[in-house]
Amino acid sequence: RSEISHCLPTMLDAARQVAGNEYQIIVAAAPGVEDAFYQPFIQGEILTRDTYKVLTEAKAAIVNSGTATLEAALIGCPQTAVYYIAGSKYLEKLLRPIIFSIPNFTLVNIILQGQVIQELIASRFTTENVAHELQRLLYDQEYRKNMLKQYQQLYTILGDTSAANNAADKIYTLISNCDETNQ
């Protein structure tokens, strides 16, 4: 709930700036969080629990970093990932060397070993940055096409069956290799 309270207002402000009358904003509710919790944030947007259907039909998504980024990629939805760090102004200053030395935070970027989707984390998670990235996702056809093309590599890496196990194995291998190079 805290994560939703911190992230959703910025996500919605950015989406409202970009959507205008051209796009409908849909909020996919998190499992276990009742609809009433979302009401103070929603101003005419649609609230749904059918996340997969929304991602299938969406032209673009703003996704809170986590497994949802991988799900959106496997569905084929262009996205940007956001993540709020509580006390981020102070924590970021303290943890900056660690936070920004990690090349990728999202599962998509970790598995594909590159910056496929934009990660707006800590102080980079602002309404302006999210709106800018959302505009790129919606209107820059080359950018969208490239992202979707890179998503196809996920199927090769993860395979057609046991995607979750393959993803876990790949992430474990990458983390193990990272630990070995840092020792």
What residue ranges belong to the model's regions?
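Nucleotide-activated sugar donor-binding and catalytic core shared by glycosyltransferases
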Residues: 1-183
